[in-house]
């Protein structure tokens, strides 16, 4: 089987699972679980435009579930409350992945 097809199938399954457990995983006090969720979202953002859109959908789903005003509130709240440098790094990496994966963004250096 083509490696790209396997990756696509894997990502589809990950997305389905991610949407099912996303809200409960981020409501836990276990930062290891939350760290893994943000690492998965980062990987989705960088992998493809569809993955980027799915990561934003997951944040939007969480926002609606928690009746928040902004979809990135969870990321900023976690960043402010993070106690370890490792977790802060994962959160900042996720923000970076969102920025570099934005289709309309053109950065000139």
Regions found by a protein language model. Name each.
Residues 1-69, 84-89, 100-109:
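Elongated alpha-helical scaffolds that mediate protein-protein interactions in large eukaryotic proteins
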Residues 23, 76-80:
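Amphipathic alpha-helical repeat scaffolds
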Residues 95-96:
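Conserved C-terminal subdomain of P-loop nucleotide-binding cores
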Residues 67-77:
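Charged, helical or coil segments that form electrostatic protein-protein
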């Amino acid at each position: 089987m083509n490696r790209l097809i396997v990756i696509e199938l894997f990502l589809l399954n990950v997305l389905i699972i991610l949407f099912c457990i996303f809200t409960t995983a981020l409501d836990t006090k276990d930062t290891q679980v939350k760290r893994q969720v943000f690492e998965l979202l980062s990987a989705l953002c960088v992998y493809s435009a569809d993955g980027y859109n799915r990561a934003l959908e997951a944040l939007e789903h969480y926002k609606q579930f928690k009746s928040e005003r902004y979809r990135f509130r969870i990321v900023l709240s976690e960043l402010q409350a993070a106690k370890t440098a490792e977790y802060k790094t994962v959160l900042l990496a996720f923000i970076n992945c969102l920025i570099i994966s934005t289709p309309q963004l053109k950065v000139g250096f």
